[in-house]
A protein has these predicted regions:
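Conserved, mostly hydrophobic/aromatic
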Residues: 62, 141, 193
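Substrate-binding surface in catalytic domains of secreted glycosidases
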Residues: 158-226
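Substrate-binding cleft of extracellular glycoside hydrolase catalytic domains
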Residues: 77-146
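Catalytic domains of carbohydrate-active enzymes, especially glycoside hydrolases
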Residues: 45-72, 128-136
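Short, acidic/polar
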Residues: 43-54, 113-130, 177-183
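Boundary/entry segment of secreted carbohydrate-active catalytic domains
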Residues: 23-54, 65, 80-82, 91-93, ...
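Alpha-helical scaffolding within the catalytic cores
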Residues: 43-51, 75-87, 176-185, 218-221
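Active-site beta-loop-alpha junctions enriched in small/polar residues
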Residues: 38-42, 67, 100-104, 144-148, ...
Length: 226
């Protein structure tokens, strides 16, 4: 893979997919982990298309960035990514859509206007994909959520699931969330979650050694989640 192409497909060594069993205790998970990839690009130029065409067959699935939400005060602002559906519908593996949501300073709850707005955005992504004959395997929510807001985030996830059913809704999660009582409720509200095990520790200084993914720390986090 060329240097440019290498930047386009991010291996899921940085994110491990773990299915949550809703409403029941699940047994300890085991076995090999599937290799999947993210396409986290706002601009779909030819190198992005070529990377997918040439390398998607190496993965069990792709998740493509479809929209990003930032906040101006308490008002959400959306940037949509114009996907090339002709490439995605011909991909040799299942394709999921990702909705990225930046940190939210406001409270997170079930009945506020932001929840309704975000659920409508989520539904519109699935509808647009379906109109281009792409049936997404899931909608993945990547929300920079404060640990104090995990219960409110659960209300968002429940709203998203109602809007996009029967498409599954998964979330990304941090290892630090695993210790929070609210996380169990959040995970049970989703159809699955991706444990983000990259950059678990912030560098102590600007010139300190930096590791994108520590395999030993990642394995410990996965064992805790499993």
């Amino acid at each position: 893979m060329c240097a440019r192409g290498a930047a386009l497909l991010a291996l899921c060594a940085a994110g491990i997919f773990l299915s949550s069993t809703r409403g029941s205790e699940s047994p300890h998970a085991g076995g090999p982990l599937a290799h999947e990839a993210y396409v986290w690009q706002r601009v779909w130029n030819q190198p992005v298309r070529d990377a997918i065409k040439q390398h998607a067959s190496q993965f069990a699935g792709l998740t493509v960035l479809n929209a990003e939400v930032s906040w101006k005060g308490e008002q959400p602002q959306v940037i949509r990514v114009p996907l090339d559906y002709s490439v995605l519908t011909n991909a040799p593996c299942p394709v999921g859509l990702a909705l990225r949501i930046g940190p939210c300073a406001a409270s997170v709850s079930a009945n506020d206007t932001a929840t309704v707005f975000l659920a409508d955005v989520a539904a519109s992504l699935v509808t647009e994909a379906s109109s281009h004959r792409l049936v997404p395997r899931e909608l993945q929510i990547d929300f920079d959520c404060a640990e104090s807001k995990l219960d409110g985030y659960r209300a968002w996830v429940e709203a998203f699931r109602r809007k996009v059913a029967p498409v599954p809704v998964s979330i990304t999660a941090l290892p630090s969330w695993l210790e929070q009582p609210a996380f169990k409720r959040l995970a049970e509200a989703a159809d699955g979650y991706v444990l983000q095990v990259h950059s678990l520790q912030r560098p102590r200084a600007y010139d300190a050694p930096f590791t994108l993914c520590d395999p030993a720390a990642a394995r410990r986090a996965v064992e805790r989640a499993a």
